[in-house]
């Protein structure tokens, strides 16, 4: 298995363990997987490409294709856990994890499964991926102070810092979860997705399309915009993303945007690309569970002078905050213009 699949299988097993899900008591045909990767097995791809150049095609591993393709993480999770229900892997760049969670939600709502493992995985910290992102000017160049290089919404932000890992949740139909006495962290209440149709990498500068996605997810959750307490933002620490997200939040929430708590996990763990949505969904759920909002660290200088609009919302700077959170939203944006948003609510029996 490629490193990306190792991450996925490990996260899936940990999720099952945490959920106390006994697969020997479940119908495997009613339990599925939706776990994707933005890039797939890039370590395998690089290794085999170098071997092709140095030793020729006869030396390429017969496992190259199965190890490289992005859907193999979902397949290997099923093999490792025995889940025989719906099995898919969505690829929408950095929106992958959120899209997978949303698709898993719909799978349960449509009645095609009772349990879904959902999220994203990525292992792209490799020379070729770093070079590619660096040459397109997406990465921070603050090499003198790397601990502070990821600084979402800060005036001095200059690009993201790459991270890697996997985040997988157990989504379960409510009555099924109650019947087995599962601990319910939160209710996944809403999902929406759309596309900017604007540029291969840059987000919609008007914020209109991501705003529409966020608004649709909030509506799907059956809540009013003013009921949202917290947003786990995409917050990549790039100029365009953080500005565009702020504009979108203001469009959706109006004056309530200034009462929202907004933070970016990427300030602490970097940008996990296709895994970002999975890990950030878990952080959002734990925010609701514990009523503690994670901070945006490395936030020092407010960006109030941008000609396209000030970044003047509450980004929960530098210290976690104790606050009751009943409704929270997590949003992610991906190259290609992909937008995806999910809404969680505090579960009340």
Located regions from the model:
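Condensing-enzyme catalytic core mediating Claisen C-C bond formation in acyl metabolism
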Residues: 144-221, 229-230, 349
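Acyl-CoA/ACP chain-elongation machinery
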Residues: 112-158, 191-205, 235-242, 259-313
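Conserved beta-ketoacyl condensing-enzyme motif
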Residues: 1-92, 121-130, 225-241
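Conserved small-residue
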Residues: 12, 33, 77, 97, ...
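Flexible, low-complexity linker/loop segments at domain and module junctions
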Residues: 27-28, 221-227, 258, 311-349
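Active-site-proximal alpha-helical scaffold in enzymes
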Residues: 8-21, 70-74, 78-81, 86-122, ...
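A glycine- and small-aliphatic-rich helix-loop capping segment at beta-alpha/alpha-beta transitions
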Residues: 43-57, 107-110, 130-143, 205-208, ...
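Glycine/charged-rich beta-loop-alpha catalytic/anionic-binding loops adjacent to active sites
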Residues: 52-63, 80-90, 147-155, 195, ...
